[in-house]
């Protein structure tokens, strides 16, 4: 059976960035295996925040490789993301990994996809996982029509997403820079 289901959301707003992830792990289409998974973590001297969607073992492999590139590049998020993407595209083992990363620092937001793409959103809002599209839509609406902080927008967007997406819950991990 396929293990799936999560939402990871990044919101960059008013000079701050928030990265939120829910805690649900779902087996197949109908069984919730865990409610309190931690899919968001700080990296490289607390200057980078990363979240994952996809198979847990694959995500940890990517976290480890990404962390190594952050160390090699002295925390340069752009270079680390590009180097990981290059390796991801070239390595036969990595190409089979079923995971995505959403990474942020004080200046950049990137989605690192399983095909080796590095995507930086135009508006600083990005999401991955089963509820990603709902979370992005909610965050964009809140940015345009409220005075909330990045963290408040991320939290409220994840609440809205959890009401719509059965693979997302409200046990959030929220980190900010």
From Swiss-Prot:
User: What processes in GO biological process is this protein linked to?
Assistant: proteolysis involved in protein catabolic process
Q: Does the keyword Thylakoid apply?
A: no
Main localisation: cytoplasm
Matches recorded under CDD domains: protease_HslV (cd01913)
Q: Can you state which reaction this protein catalyses? A: ATP-dependent cleavage of peptide bonds with broad specificity
One GO CC term on file: proteasome core complex
PANTHER family listed in its UniProt record: ATP-DEPENDENT PROTEASE SUBUNIT HSLV, METALLOPROTEASE TLDD
What's the family?
Belongs to the peptidase T1B family. HslV subfamily.
According to UniProt, the name of this protein is ATP-dependent protease subunit HslV
């Amino acid at each position: 059976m396929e293990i799936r289901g999560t939402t990871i959301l990044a919101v960059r707003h008013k000079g701050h960035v928030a990265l939120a992830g829910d805690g649900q792990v779902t087996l197949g289409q109908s069984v919730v295996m865990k409610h309190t998974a931690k899919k968001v973590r700080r990296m490289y001297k607390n200057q980078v925040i990363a979240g994952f969607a996809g198979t847990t073992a694959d995500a940890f492999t990517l976290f480890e490789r990404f962390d190594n590139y952050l160390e090699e590049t002295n925390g340069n998020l752009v270079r680390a993301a590009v180097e990981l993407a290059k390796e991801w595209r070239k390595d036969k083992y990595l190409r089979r990994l079923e995971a995505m990363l959403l990474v942020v620092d004080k200046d950049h937001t990137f989605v690192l996809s399983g095909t080796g793409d590095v995507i930086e959103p135009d508006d600083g809002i990005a999401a991955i996982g089963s509820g990603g599209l709902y979370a992005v839509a909610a965050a964009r609406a809140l940015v345009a029509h409220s005075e909330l902080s990045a963290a408040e927008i991320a939290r409220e967007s994840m609440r809205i997403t959890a009401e719509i997406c059965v693979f997302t819950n409200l046990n959030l991990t929220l980190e900010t820079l």
